[in-house]
Amino acid sequence: MSNAITMGIFWHLIGAASAACFYAPFKQVKQWSWETMWSVGGIVSWLILPWTISALLLPDFWAYYGQFNLSTLLPVFLFGAMWGIGNINYGLTMRYLGMSMGIGIAIGITLIVGTLMTPIINGNFDVLIHTEGGHMTLLGVFVALIGVGIVTRAGQLKERKMGIKAEEFNLKKGLLLAVMCGIFSAGMSFAMNAAKPMHEAAAALGVDPLYVALPSYVVIMGGGALVNLGFCFIRLAKVQNLSIKADFSLARPLIISNILLSALGGLMWYLQFFFYAWGHARIPAQYDYMSWMLHMSFYVLCGGLVGLVLKEWKNAGRRPVAVLSLGCVVIIIAANIVGLGMAS
């Protein structure tokens, strides 16, 4: 396996670790509605950071975006909005299925859809079917799904042992939302694929290869921001017991603390895709769609490890932890199989 591929896998791991940890600061926010907290974090992660980073990278910010016609920008924006819909459905999936089953089904579907639909759309699926490297990467995807399934099972055992249940368990509604979440969340993978002309234009301006994907985030995350912030603002305006005015009428130290914690959560959310761009840049072009598989499987891996570090599994017993450990090992094996496939 080449050093470039190894570093690509490593950066995807770092990005996934940030994704697994980003909600920790949000959990420390006090006396704010979820909608206000999510909006503040989202403004940082989807608007302020993408625009700021792009302004620092590009020699002429407005000229760069002005060179693209609507046929280039609109698919990138709409795929970003598609991801935004999946993001909202994610929370509802947890509500009706519980954390473990919801995450397992949603992540499994988005891993398959986001990874395999891209080469199909690009007309490159024959690379997977007719080459040795393609066979290896497909095997890696299959093994990753097994790993996700094992971690999901560990989570179910933990929830059963600790008496944790879904807020409003509804299998039919939860499965529908999980499928929708999985499909729509893959919009981020499709957006990265549609944004290739933007990446090439950034490279032509002399932007370092590690950073060429970052300017496209202004458009991708703009689409996601429209859906997420629109959802939050509508709820803040219409739901009777929600009030942004009340959230900002607390004691000043608490408001400042909540803003900083929400902003930190937003920063950590953004960093997952900052390092995703670094990893993506190191993956061979013919296998660039495997970035999504690496990111999502590592997200499950890191989520399990973070849970262990934070002692969320302390009272779960030995069997759930053993099953979790097995799932993490399988995901690591899957990443190595994919790496070997890309190198062959």
Swiss-Prot record:
It is a multi-pass membrane protein. One of its GO terms (molecular function) is symporter activity. Keywords: Cell inner membrane, Cell membrane, Membrane, Sugar transport, Symport, Transmembrane, Transmembrane helix, Transport. Disulfide bonds: none annotated. One of its GO terms (cellular component) is plasma membrane. It catalyses: L-rhamnopyranose(in) + H(+)(in) = L-rhamnopyranose(out) + H(+)(out). It comes from the Bacteria. It is found in: Cell inner membrane. Pfam families: RhaT (PF06379). The chain crosses the membrane at residues 4-24, 38-58, 68-88, 101-121, 131-151, 175-195, 214-234, 259-279, 290-310, 321-341. InterPro entries: L-rhamnose-proton_sym_RhaT. Uptake of L-rhamnose across the cytoplasmic membrane with the concomitant transport of protons into the cell (symport system). Belongs to the L-rhamnose transporter (TC 2.A.7.6) family. This is L-rhamnose-proton symporter. The lineage of its organism: Bacteria, Pseudomonadati, Pseudomonadota, Gammaproteobacteria, Enterobacterales.
